[in-house]
Amino acid sequence: MENTEQEHNLPEGDETQWPNGVKRKRKNSQCSMNSTSDKSISVPGYVPSYLEKDEPCVVCGDKATGYHYRCITCEGCKGFFRRTIQKNLHPSYSCKYDSCCIIDKITRNQCQLCRFRKCISVGMAMDLVLDDSKRVAKRRLIEENREKRKKEEIVKTLHNRPEPTVSEWELIRMVTEAHRHTNAQGPHWKQKRKFLPEDIGQSPAPTSDNDKVDLEAFSEFTKIITPAITRVVDFAKKLPMFSELPCEDQIILLKGCCMEIMSLRAAVRYDPESETLTLSGEMAVSREQLKNGGLGVVSDAIFDLGKSLSQFNLDDSEVALLQAVLLMSSDRSGLTCVEKIEKCQEMYLLAFEHYINHRKHNISHFWPKLLMKVTNLRMIGACHASRFLHMKVECPTELFPPLFLEVFEDQEGSTGVAAQEDGSCLR
């Protein structure tokens, strides 16, 4: 009897063979020849190298994108299977055609039950689908592993960076010794420093404007300026290659770098506990005292530099090499041996960079950050040059030590102090 005949197996396509032999389109079918809304659209994307070209999905035959839940499938079937398991939807699936639908990339959206059964029959594993908590944990683990790999790459890069050569180690040794022999009090500066009395230079006189110089504080600073300048000169004379330069170039370089090196030496002796800098290894001063004693805004720049450098944990060699780089600045106006000075600075910079590699600081991008301090020090030197003119107006000439004037006054056309008999320049 017709009403008892069983439904035949479905033929290819989305047509259904009914018992009476009449072929009918499924209700709500979106696969008619005139419809383009459900045509498979292949979106180009990443395809793993282990897949053959245009390898098909084992569920629907669409282009596969990789192994998903233990089978080679497309993104659509992967997502369908995952959603079904995560939301426990399969008990509610049903088939109108006796569970014998053919699943391909055209019909896959028409019967959820047959599609799910096809997923299971080809070997997709339900136990590999993660619930929300496991999925979050997996993503967290992936991120942690990614960060771990990044850190390993950084460590690997650090280990592969070149360290000083034998000749560079010798250069570093000589520069370090030059610094240690000319750096007042050395590592014992904290024990030997004396604090400038609090009543000196703390605030401008009430009747004066904010840019007046506190003469008492200025007078205290001038007592230590001459030995501080002399130590910078002595440091330069001990450096390889500096004494080979013409006397005129030596003077230009010393005048240009003197304030920069003195500022660096003060900045590395910043004490965060007392919020003071120690000048010339002996006089501890506050920001306001240094500012009101003549330096003005330059004081802020030096203190800010000190705060920043306190995080760098520089050793004597790094401070010494910074000073050498500042000294051998080939862009100082009036130099004659520009190329020679530039090559000298390059030698110091290369040895410096290799020494930084050897030290392996924990600060990221340590080398470029440290080079930025050279720029900061150059700006301090430039600001002090204009500030010096203000001090000359505000302070009596007799308060200025001769060497202070000689180094910081503009003496175009003059070489300053005459050369000594041994050919060295400045005192």
Swiss-Prot record:
State where it is primarily located. nucleus
Q: Where is this region: Disordered?
A: 1-40
Q: What ranges does the record give for the region Modulating, renumbered to this chain?
A: 1-56
- Point to the regions of Polar residues compositional bias: 29-40
Q: In which tissues is it expressed?
A: After the mid-blastula transition (MBT), expressed throughout the deep cells, which give rise to the embryo proper. In adults, isoform 2 shows highest expression in the eye and liver. Expressed in adult gonads.
Keyword field: Activator, Developmental protein, DNA-binding, Metal-binding, Nucleus, Receptor, Repressor, Transcription, Transcription regulation, Zinc, Zinc-finger
A single MF term (Gene Ontology): zinc ion binding
Q: Please provide, in alphabetical order, the Gene Ontology terms of the cellular component aspect for this entry.
A: nucleus; RNA polymerase II transcription regulator complex
Residues spanning the membrane: none
Q: Which residues form the NR LBD domain?
A: 167-410
Any one Gene Ontology biological process term?
Answer: positive regulation of DNA-templated transcription
Where does the protein end up? Answer: Nucleus
Alphabetized CDD domains for the sequence: NR_DBD_TR, NR_LBD_TR
UniProt xrefs under Pfam families: Hormone_recep (PF00104), zf-C4 (PF00105)
Zn-finger (NR C4-type) intervals are: 57-77, 95-119
DNA-binding region boundaries: 57-131
Function in brief: High affinity receptor for triiodothyronine. In the absence of thyroid hormone during late blastula stage development, acts as a transcriptional repressor. Whereas in the presence of thyroid hormone, can act as an activator of transcription. In addition, represses retinoic acid (RA)-signaling during blastula and gastrula stages of development.
Q: How does it assemble?
A: Interacts with ncoa2.
The entry's free-text remark on domains says:
Composed of three domains: a modulating N-terminal domain, a DNA-binding domain and a C-terminal ligand-binding domain. The C-terminal extension present in isoform 1 and absent in isoform 2 (the F-domain) regulates transcriptional activity by altering the selectivity of binding to cofactors.
**Record-stated family:** Belongs to the nuclear hormone receptor family. NR1 subfamily.
Q: In its UniProt entry, what is this protein called?
A: Thyroid hormone receptor alpha-A
Q: Which organism is it from?
A: Danio rerio (Zebrafish)
